[in-house]
Amino acid sequence: METITKKARSLYIPYAGPVLLEFPLLNKGSAFSVEERRNFNLSGLLPEVVESIEEQAERAWLQYQGFKTEIDKHIYLRNIQDTNETLFYRLVQNHLEEMMPVIYTPTVGAACERFSEIYRRARGVFISYPNRHNMDDILQNVPNHNIKVIVVTDGERILGLGDQGIGGMGIPIGKLSLYTACGGISPAYTLPVVLDVGTNNQQLLNDPLYMGWRHPRITDDEYYAFVDEFIQAVKQRWPDILLQFEDFAQKNAMPLLTRYRDEICSFNDDIQGTAAVTVGTLIAASRAAGSQLSEQKIVFLGAGSAGCGIAEQIIAQTQREGLSEDAARQNVFMVDRFGLLTDRMPNLLPFQAKLVQKCDNLQHWDTENDVLSLLDVVRNVKPDILIGVSGQTGLFTEEIIREMHKHCPRPIVMPLSNPTSRVEATPQDIIAWTEGNALVATGSPFSPVIWKDKIYPIAQCNNAYIFPGIGLGVIASGASRITDEMLMSASETLAKHSPLVNNGEGLVLPALKDIQVVSRAIAFAVGKMAQQQGVAVKTSAEALQQAIDDNFWKPEYRDYRRTSI
């Protein structure tokens, strides 16, 4: 499949008849013209009327509205995706705000949990550990030769739901749907992959419908050797691929990123994408308040790879704003289930050890507890920003939020855990506990809050603001790596598109209807930074913009011409 440019050329294809109708990337359904029906042996296989894609999308929208539950809507949309991808993306594009929570978080969580139950049709690649020696052959079975973006998971830490085995495939499928819907990357360029290394979820192992390898998860050297076989096979098949690691467990996520980020063009969205969108949100929120991020004190609940990744990017940004590294680190406080991370805490992971507070600096704190709880930290630090990445519901209690508000007139509270069932506090409660003074951004979508007859829109700190633009920028520029500076440029660009900053009112993040505009801007910034960093060939700004335009796929049908195989 070629990328659609401004003037879509005719596409020459060898398929015909029922085979063509079964090819999701090429199928037009009732939109095949009279001439195409004749040339491709489709006469009589479709109803008489030739429809436009908008007419098809209107019918699909009416059918969609007939489903009452979010999971049924998800299944319906996935069925369209698996039969006619162009129609799927036109429908999603027409109703993005309505459908994004259905094709991705929070509904995708339920789809992952019920993957084997609701399975309809194969999509993507499943590589099981018993098949590890056939890795090259498996990737050769992928019919699309021009794959440019892979999202891969091993299913061990799916959202806040834990080990879902091969059910985790729902995440790469959903993520790549957003690469296309938000970032304009052709679906012909994308490939979802799940590494089936077993599961420790006993419920799945006991489920007679479970479709994955029924075996406890492999670990340690066996696990890392298997992942390495996969990476090497991908490099052999698609040397210029962009590989996104998704929903790997904390113990593996950072080691894999560290090992491969300089070997293959790759990033971890849970660590780097979440950090980029969070930092972009915080830059915008700080500017809207007339200050800088470097002036804020920040407390985290959750010191896993995602939380620590956000913290490190905040530290990098505040250094850019003029702080020394030591001063920047003193403004960030990490709390996990064992309390505040300090230099006397044993058994910390390497990425956590860099974010400890020195106990000598805490001697003046007003507390009698040996373990410094979140409430102790909030009471003594008096933070401006509170970020939740714990994956545990209800941990931002009324006492904690009111204590924060006591010392901060306009607190920024970001319960980012997904899905909505795992959020640290609901926006409704946070707004009420702060008398309507908090700026709230969440990880999953929430409806606006009505408090004392005033409406408070809730920004969704969604990685979809970031990763589609990064992907488009990498493809357009031909970047060979994703650097920290490229991620920072994405954060800065997102902040520049904040309605709250630009207009003095509204959401801190752009409306979802504007996400393609934001993705294009991020793609340009990322591509330009890649050139400056020497990981992409330097071109003029005009040439880079043209490459972005040329690679931005639109859900429009093209004219088909018949060719022989």
Swiss-Prot record:
NAD(+) binds at residues 157, 270, 418. It holds the Pfam family Malic_M. HAMAP family: NAD_malic_enz (MF_01619). One of its GO terms (biological process) is malate metabolic process. GO terms for cellular component: cytosol. This is NAD-dependent malic enzyme. Homotetramer. Belongs to the malic enzymes family. Its cofactor is Mg(2+); Mn(2+). It comes from the Bacteria. PANTHER family: MALIC ENZYME-RELATED (PTHR23406), NAD-DEPENDENT MALIC ENZYME, MITOCHONDRIAL (PTHR23406:SF34). The keyword Metal-binding applies. PROSITE patterns: MALIC_ENZYMES (PS00331). Keywords: Metal-binding, NAD, Oxidoreductase. The keyword Oxidoreductase applies. The active site is at residues 104, 175. InterPro entries: Aminoacid_DH-like_N_sf, Malic_enzyme_CS, Malic_N_dom, Malic_N_dom_sf, Malic_NAD-bd, Malic_OxRdtase, NAD(P)-bd_dom_sf, NAD_malic_enz_proteobac. GO terms for molecular function: malate dehydrogenase (decarboxylating) (NAD+) activity; metal ion binding; NAD binding; oxaloacetate decarboxylase activity. It catalyses: (S)-malate + NAD(+) = pyruvate + CO2 + NADH; oxaloacetate + H(+) = pyruvate + CO2. Its EC number is 1.1.1.38. A divalent metal cation binds at residues 246-247, 270. The record marks 270 as: Important for activity. Divalent metal cations. Prefers magnesium or manganese.
